[in-house]
Amino acid sequence: MISMDEIKERVILVAVDTDGSDQAERSLDELGELAKTAGAEVVGRMIQPRESIHPGTYIGKGKILELKELLWETHGTGIICDDELTSVQMGNLEAELDCKIMDRTLLILDIFAARAVSGEGKIQVELAQLKYRASRLAGLGKSLSRLGGGIGTRGPGEKKLEMDRRLIRERISRLKKELKDVERHRELIRGQRKQSGLKVAALVGYTSAGKSSIENALTQAGVLEDAMLFSTLDTTTRALTLDNTQEILLTDTVGFINKLPHHLVEAFKSTLEEAKYADIIVHVVDASNPQMDAQMHVVYETLRQLGAEGKPVITLFNKQDKVENPVNHKDLQADYSIATSAKTGQGLEEFKHALFEIIRKEQIYIERLYYFSEAGKIQLIRSKGQLLSEEYVPEGIEVKAYVPQDIYGRL
C-alpha cells in the first residue's frame, strides 16, 4: 500500500462511452483499482454516452452541472477521467468544477513513481512524468497545487516535481542521457547472456496476473508479490534448472494494462524490450479474472507494438486456486497452454517440461568421437549445450550431447 501524508482523496471516476458496449464500465472498474492503489477513495462514478470525446471538456458542457452536484453530494475532492486529457480539457474542467482534475495517465504515472525502486526505474518514471507535464503546464499547475500534494504530485523518491517549463526541458535532456547509459548497460548484459548460450524466457502479462509469484515459486527469487497493481516495475532475471543439466534464464517484466500511457511505453522501452529480445514468451494470465479475454488481447497487442512476435509462446492460465469452476482454456496464439497456480504449484512441472521441449526442438543431437586433442570442443559443448555423456576410450572421448544450432558447425 502506498503511504499518503495527505488526507485520503475522495474522487469521482468519469468516462465517455463512445460505442454503447460495456467497455466503459469495465474500464472504470479497472480505473477504480488504480485509484485504490494510489491511495484514493472512490466515492462516485459517471459515464457519459457520446459519439466522441468532447475536445473542450471531455464529457461535454451539458454533463458538467450533473458532475458538480455529484461532487457536492459525495464531498468529492477531485475527478479522475478514464482517458488522457489535453491541457485544454484539464484547464476547462478545473475552471468549471473548481476541484482537482486528473486522468488515467497521471494516475498510472503516480503509481509508477511510488513503486520505482532501482535507479533505472526512477529515471524512467521521472522522464515519463516530465514529458507528460511539459505539454500540460497551463491546465495542470493550478489543479495539482490543490490539497498540498496527493495523487499526481509524487515523483520517484517522494520528491516534488518542478512545474517550470525551462527546468523541465533541462531535466528531460539530462534524464535522456542517463537513460542512454542504462540502455547501453542493458545491451551489454544481453550480449553476455547470448554468449553464455542460455536461452531467455520472458514472463509477460497483464498487471497482477501473477508473474512475480510464478518466478518466485520456480526460482525462490524473493521478488515482491503484491495484490496491488504494478507491484513490479524493475525486471529481475533468475536461472531456472529444467533438468539435471539444462538451464534457462527467467525474466520477470513490468505488467501491461489497457491504455498504457505512451509516455511510459517510450520511457520504459528498454525494460519492455526484454520481451522483444527473449527467446521464449511466457504469457501469464489471471484465469480467475472475468476480464481475462480482454486482458489477453491487450497483452498480445502490446507485444505486437514492441515487435516481440514470431517467438514460441507458453500461456500459463494462472491462479487456478482462485477459479471456482475450472475450465480447460486453450490459447490459440500459443504453442502451449497450461493451467497453473503459483500458490499450490499446479502445472509448474508441466511448464518446465514445455520450456525444455522448446529448447530441445532447437538443438541438434550428436554422437561423436573426439580425439584427446579436441578437448576444447567438448568444453564448448559443456558450456553451450547439454552434455549427456562422455566416455573415455583408447581412441579418444565418445560424446553424446544436444547442442545449439549456432555452434554445431564448430564441432
Regions inferred by a protein language model and the residue ranges of each:
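C-terminal-of-GTPase-core extension/linker across diverse P-loop GTPases
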Residues: M1-L13, A138-A209, E215, P290, ...
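Short alpha-helix plus adjacent loop in nuclease-associated cores
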Residues: L106-A128
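Switch I (effector-binding) loop of TRAFAC-class P-loop GTPase G-domains
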Residues: R186, R193-K199, L218-E247, I257, ...
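Conserved C-terminal guanine-recognition region of P-loop GTPase G domains, centered on the G4
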Residues: S27-K36, K68-E73, L85-C99, T245-Q246, ...
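N-terminal accessory targeting/assembly segments
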Residues: M1-D110
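Flexible beta-alpha connector loops of hexameric P-loop NTPases
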Residues: T18-D22, I53-T57, R115-G119, K159-K160, ...
